[in-house]
C-alpha cells in the first residue's frame, strides 16, 4: 500500500492542529469533570452531559478534555486529535510517541483512548492547568510533525530543485 501523499498528510495534520487549538480555547473558557460539558438549563441549573446523549449544544459553560475535543471539529479531525492527546499523555510519562501521522486505529482502540483520557481528566485532584499542559504538549508535537512532514515538489520546479 503506497504511503499517503504529502498534501493529504499536511491537510490531516493541519486539521488535527485546528481541533487541538479549538479544544484549548474551549478549556480556557471553562473546564469540568464528571461530564463532557456543562450547560445551564432554562431553570438556571448547571447540568453535566456526556457524549452523544448530551447532544451538541451551541453554548456550553465548560468542557472536559474529551468534550472540548469533540466540540472543536469534524469527526475525522477529532479522532486524530484524540490520538495526539493520548500520545501526549504517554509522552508525559516518558513513553515516546509515534511521531508523524500514524495509521488510523480501529474504533475499539480509539474508544479505549477516549475512556483513558476521560478517566485521566476526571481523576480527583486534576487541575485545568494540567489538562491545558497536556493539550499544549499535543499541539507542540503536531507542530513538530507539520515541520517534518514531506512536501510536494512544485510541478514546474526544475529537476535540480526537486527533492530526490
Residue ranges of predicted features:
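Domain-length accessory/inserted modules outside core catalytic folds
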Residues: 1-164
Amino acid at each position: 500500500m503506497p504511503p499517503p501523499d504529502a498534501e493529504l498528510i499536511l491537510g490531516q495534520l493541519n486539521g488535527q492542529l485546528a481541533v487541538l487549538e479549538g479544544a484549548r480555547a474551549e478549556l480556557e473558557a471553562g473546564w469540568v469533570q464528571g461530564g463532557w460539558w456543562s450547560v445551564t438549563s432554562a431553570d438556571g441549573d448547571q447540568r453535566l452531559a456526556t457524549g452523544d446523549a448530551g447532544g451538541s449544544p451551541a453554548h456550553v459553560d465548560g468542557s472536559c478534555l474529551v468534550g472540548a475535543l469533540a466540540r472543536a471539529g469534524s469527526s475525522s479531525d477529532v479522532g486524530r486529535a484524540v490520538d495526539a492527546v493520548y500520545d501526549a499523555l504517554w509522552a508525559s510519562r516518558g513513553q515516546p510517541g509515534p511521531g508523524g501521522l500514524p495509521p488510523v486505529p480501529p474504533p475499539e482502540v480509539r474508544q479505549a483512548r477516549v475512556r483513558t483520557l476521560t478517566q485521566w481528566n476526571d481523576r480527583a485532584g486534576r487541575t485545568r492547568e494540567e489538562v491545558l499542559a497536556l493539550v499544549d504538549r499535543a499541539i507542540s508535537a503536531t507542530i513538530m510533525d507539520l515541520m517534518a512532514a514531506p512536501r510536494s515538489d512544485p510541478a514546474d520546479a526544475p529537476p535540480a530543485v526537486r527533492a530526490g
